[in-house]
C-alpha cells in the first residue's frame, strides 16, 4: 500500500549527495527515539486524561501517542488538549495520552496513526518529512528568525496547507506545538565558520540536515539518537545539534560542553489525527477538537520560552560554555548554506514562496 510504504521510508531513507558535495550514510541502527531532534526526551509513565469519563462510559476514548516525556512542554500541552476535549464534550470524548514512546517510536506510532490503531499523535518534522516530503522545507536553516515568525506563518494559509496536505497519507493535521530553535553543541569551542572545517557533526538522517552540515564545512554523521552520548565519548562525532532542552535533558553537555547559540533551525511539531476518525466526527465535535487544540497551542507557547531559558541557565550552572555568535558570524553561516536554499527552493518552491510571502519577504 503506497501510504504505508511511504511511512516505512521514514525509517530507512538512504541519502545521496548533498547540496555542498558531501555524502551521507544511512543510519542502519534502530529508528530514532524520543531523544531525536525533534526535540523529545524519554520519560517513565503514562499521563491519562479523561479517566473519570471512562469510568462513567464515554462515547469515545482516543489514544494519543507522543515520544515526549511527561514533564516536557509538548506533553503538558497535549494533556491540556485532552482535558479540554473532555470538558468541552461534557465527557463524551476521553483521551489517553501515552507519552515517553510507550506506543513505540515516532515512525512506529505514525504507522499506527495511519492504520487507525492510534487516534492522535505528535509528529516531529524529522519523522514527518519522510512521509510528507514538502514539510522538509521547514528545516531550511535560518528560515525563521525566531518562533514569532514561525507562528505567524503557521497561523495562516501555510499552516492550513500543511495540515490538509497530510490527507494523502490517511492523516489530518489538527495543530502545531513549538519544537524550539536548534543549536550546535561540540567537544571543542566553535565560534566561527572555520571551526566547522572537518568537524564530525551528528544530525538526523535527513538529506537537508546533512547538506546543511556539509555546507558549513563539517562532516555529517548519522547515528541513532540513543547513541549520541557514546558517539561523543568515543569520538565518532565531535558535536551535534538540538534545542537547549534536549542538550540538558540528555546530558550531552557532559561530553560536548560548548553550546553555540546560533538558532540555525526553528521548528514545530505537528499534532495529527487519523483521517477516518476526523471524517467521522460531527461538525460540533470537529469544532471541539479545534478549540481544544487552540487552547493547548496557546499554553504550549506560554511555557516553551520559559523552559528554554531555564535550560540555558541550568546548562551554565552545570559548567557548559554558552557561545553567543555575533551578527557577522551568523551572516557567514547563512552565506555558506546558500546552496541548501538553491537546491530546496527548486524542490519546494511553491511552499517556500508562500512562507516568504507570509513573512513579507
Where do the model's predicted regions map?
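Positively charged n-region of N-terminal signal peptides that target proteins for export
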Residues: 1-9
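C-terminal motif of bacterial Sec signal peptides marking the signal peptidase cleavage site
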Residues: 16-19
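N-terminal secretory/targeting leader peptides
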Residues: 21-29, 41, 50-148, 166-361
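Intrinsically disordered, low-complexity segments used as extracellular stalks/linkers
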Residues: 35, 40-48
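A gly/proline- and charged-residue-enriched helix-loop-helix capping module
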Residues: 149-163
